[in-house]
């Protein structure tokens, strides 16, 4: 045994050309933080790469006496591929230091995170924007708009420059689109997308797993039944264009029962705010993909999106998504009535940040074109975006990846960047 509490080299060198599985467990929060930190590096690195590096560094360097253990409560299975022999070496180091294999892995990850601090932080501390994307009608594309604005808010400057370069190289060279990207600014904000809809469209469309009904969830946090931290459920999206800044709070099927639970809750209008408040200091923007509902859960979302004392106008509020057809107008009227009733009953200001017309197709004729004109000339709310009905969003949904990952130069992606700029 050497002075570093690591076993002597027994001649079994690691073989980087071959890989073997490493079965262990990590707390979800630690795994997610490692994944996000890896994606935020320049150039971005994979979870497999940084985990291997963390184990290697921990094996080579001694631990301080009385190093506190990492809490492994709620750990879940975690398997990745390591260079052949590295996991065996890790087990020897753990045995020498008197810790379990999982505890050793967690300590290695913790040390790596400490040695590789975040290169960016919340840009506007204390000024969290809370945006509720809503409509009582289902199928209008609230999820498309929610995740599109989130992607636009988190996108890195280098990737926006790349979009501009690609547009200029395009043989068509659409001057209007080029000008719009030239006028856009990469926000590079830290964003949390919250799937508040029990149908879990946002979660599934981004390739994430829906939370199990009997496990921890946002609904349980709202009802005061959550054991642990809501932060442990947050999942980072690892596409390098978002720099580790875009996170998702997945949906859970138990949200179908949320309205019934809120009916007997003493502070039901504050329930969502109470649940999400501990996360606010970690983000610049929270975007809530709301369900097609006029129930108590929607009341809680609208209350959360109100303008708080001291907040500037336009900082938080509602984005209403519609289509260029008559049934969307009926649903809009119902939602507007709910918002007005809530403001009257509670005395809180709820701002209408804008209207987004989604799935627009002028080829559908007079109904579509006249409806669009009606939306664009409304007095009580301004139209901040018109997203066309094109194949790229459907392709991204089928592939279960973000639209900006699938086709960052698509007209839909450009329109969603414009929408975000309009409300920024």
State each model region's role.
Residues 2-15, 20-22, 32, 36, ...:
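P-loop NTP-binding core
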């Amino acid at each position: 045994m050497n002075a570093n509490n690591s076993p002597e080299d027994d001649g079994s060198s690691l073989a980087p050309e071959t890989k073997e599985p490493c079965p262990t467990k990590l707390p979800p929060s630690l795994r997610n933080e490692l994944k996000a930190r890896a994606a935020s590096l320049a150039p971005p690195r994979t979870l497999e790469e940084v985990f291997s590096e963390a184990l290697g560094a921990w094996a080579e360097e001694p631990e301080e006496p009385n190093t506190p253990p990492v809490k492994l409560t709620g750990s879940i299975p975690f398997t990745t591929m390591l260079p052949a022999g590295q996991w065996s070496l890790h087990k020897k180091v753990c045995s020498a230091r008197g810790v379990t294999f999982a505890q050793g892995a967690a300590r290695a990850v913790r040390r790596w995170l400490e040695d590789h601090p975040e290169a960016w932080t919340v840009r506007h501390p204390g000024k969290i924007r809370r945006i509720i994307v809503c409509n009582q009608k289902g199928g209008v594309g609230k999820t498309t708009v929610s995740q599109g604005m989130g992607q636009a808010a988190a996108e890195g400057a280098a990737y926006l420059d790349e979009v501009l370069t690609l547009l200029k190289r395009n043989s068509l060279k659409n001057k209007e689109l080029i000008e719009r990207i030239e006028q856009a600014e990469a926000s590079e904000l830290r964003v949390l997308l919250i799937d508040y809809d029990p149908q879990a469209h946002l979660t599934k469309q981004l390739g994430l797993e829906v939370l199990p009904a009997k496990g921890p969830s946002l609904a349980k946090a709202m009802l005061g039944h959550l054991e642990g931290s809501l932060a442990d459920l947050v999942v980072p999206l690892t596409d390098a264009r978002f720099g580790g800044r875009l996170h998702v709070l997945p949906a859970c099927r138990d949200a179908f029962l949320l309205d019934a639970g809120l009916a007997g809750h003493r502070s039901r209008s504050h329930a969502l705010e109470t649940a999400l408040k501990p996360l606010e200091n970690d983000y610049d923007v929270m975007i809530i993909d709301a369900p097609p509902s006029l129930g108590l859960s929607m009341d809680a979302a609208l209350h959360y999106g109100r303008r708080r004392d001291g907040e500037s106008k336009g900082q938080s509020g509602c984005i209403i998504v519609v289509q260029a057809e008559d049934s969307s107008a009926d649903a809009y009227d119902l939602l507007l009535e709910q918002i007005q009733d809530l403001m009257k009953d509670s005395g809180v200001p709820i701002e209408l940040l804008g209207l987004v017309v989604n799935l627009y197709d002028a080829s559908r004729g007079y109904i579509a074109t006249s409806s669009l004109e009606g939306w664009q000339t409304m007095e009580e709310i301004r139209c901040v975006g018109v997203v066309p009905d094109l194949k790229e969003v459907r392709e991204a949904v089928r592939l279960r990846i973000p639209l900006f990952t699938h086709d960052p130069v698509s007209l839909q992606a450009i329109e969603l960047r414009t929408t975000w700029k309009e409300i920024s």
